[in-house]
UniProtKB/Swiss-Prot annotation:
Protein origin, superkingdom: Viruses
Residue span of region Disordered: 76-116
Protein name as catalogued: Uncharacterized protein 1b
Biased composition (Low complexity): 85-99
Taxonomic source organism: Soybean chlorotic mottle virus
Length: 116
């Protein structure tokens, strides 16, 4: 098959994604869960692509295009508020932020303290 290098590349990427999901499962956070779900979707797409590549005799150019089209998702987490699902969780977060001590000193205050 002309695209053996590309099918090997897809197999390698599937293994890499699975390894990353295993690493994230060792430290379960909401962000890691989010990316695990996205990577599972990518694994499913890559697996379907691999099946398609093996069943058809596509040219190397077509397989290269597919490989590019199925690149890894960007490592940009979604906005923080999307992790907070329930109203009570949002309220708890707001209340904990309000209860934080306000130890902020403006730059002007710190500069005037240095001059004295």
């Amino acid at each position: 098959m002309p695209g053996d290098n590309w099918t090997n590349s897809i197999i390698f990427r599937i293994k890499t994604l699975k390894d990353q999901i295993i690493e994230w499962s060792k430290n379960p956070t909401e962000e890691n869960e989010y990316f695990s779900e996205k990577y599972l979707e990518k694994i499913n797409t890559l697996t379907k692509t691999l099946d398609w590549c093996e069943k058809s005799n596509k040219s190397e150019v077509e397989l290269r295009w597919l490989n590019q089209a199925l690149s890894l998702p960007h490592q940009v987490p979604p906005p923080r508020y999307s992790y907070i699902r329930s109203e009570s969780s949002r309220n708890n977060l707001r209340n904990s932020a309000r209860n934080q001590p306000q130890n902020l000193v403006s730059e002007q205050d710190s500069d005037s303290n240095r001059e004295n």
